Regions:
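Positively charged n-region of N-terminal signal peptides that target proteins for export
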Residues: 1-4
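Bacterial N-terminal signal peptides
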Residues: 8-20
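Short helix-initiation/N-cap motifs at beta->coil->alpha
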Residues: 69-84, 179-182, 194-200
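Extracytoplasmic "Venus flytrap"
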Residues: 34-51, 71-76
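Immediate post-signal peptide segment of exported/extracytoplasmic ligand-binding proteins
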Residues: 23-37, 47, 57-65, 140, ...
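Contiguous mixed-secondary-structure segments that line small-molecule binding/active-site clefts
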Residues: 54, 87, 92, 97-197
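Short, polar/charged alpha-helical segment
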Residues: 42-67, 182-185
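N-terminal glycine-rich cofactor-binding segment that shapes the pocket for flavin-like pterin cofactors
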Residues: 31, 73-78, 91-95
Length: 200
């Protein structure tokens, strides 16, 4: 199976490592590479995708052109299908999310475990240490080449009905969750009424 290049964003600062094989002859490059982002352009991931595409074009003297497709538009707005589309070659690379890829790569559910990490320092230690390396090996075994970890902040809870200060405040509250069974289970256990909806 063809290797896919993916940029995996875990949890807004991004550090990119350029790893395309620059020694390939021009004939081996596609006219355009498709970069999927889960969110729209004005969001940090969208802005980062656009900037990265510009830098790649600049650093390769125009040999590599990347077009950014925001809002998981290449998979009809369903972020849970992004990883499958990468594996099938419909998407060349992505600024993706472990939440969205966890239905296909169960080990990525680690980052969706409620209250697992107390702060950014702990999550950075996890992704930069042995656990992060092991997760990269798992991704590589599935023909995906991760380039960097990034962060999107800790899970937050917001709604338009009432303040949520303690778990009991969630009882009966209708709340949108991403397409991860773990999120559905977590919010159900907390007494909420979760509904799966895409970000896009």
């Amino acid at each position: 199976m063809k290797k896919c290049y993916a940029l995996l964003i875990v949890l807004v600062a991004m550090t990119f490592t350029f790893t395309f094989p620059l020694s390939l002859p021009a004939a081996d490059y596609k006219a355009e590479y498709k970069l999927s982002t889960v969110v729209a352009k004005p969001m940090p991931w969208g802005i980062a995708g656009e900037r990265w595409a510009e830098l790649v074009k600049e650093k390769t003297a125009g040999r590599i052109n990347i077009k950014v497709y925001p809002g998981v538009s290449l998979v009809g707005g369903d972020q849970t299908k992004e990883y499958t589309a990468i594996r099938q070659g419909a998407i060349d690379m992505a600024i993706g999310s472990t939440i969205n890829w966890s239905p296909q790569i169960k080990e990525l559910n680690l980052f969706s475990m409620p209250f697992l990490m107390p702060d950014y320092k702990a999550i950075d230690a996890l992704t930069r240490g042995d656990v992060g390396k092991e997760l990269w090996k798992i991704l590589e075994s599935k023909d995906t080449v991760p380039l960097a970890w990034g962060e999107n902040g800790f899970r937050e809870l917001s709604n338009s009905k009432k303040p949520v200060r303690k778990p009991d405040d969630l009882k009966g509250l209708k709340i949108r969750v991403v397409g991860s069974p773990l999120f559905l289970d977590t919010f159900t256990a907390l007494g909420a009424n979760p509904t799966q909806m895409s970000w896009a």
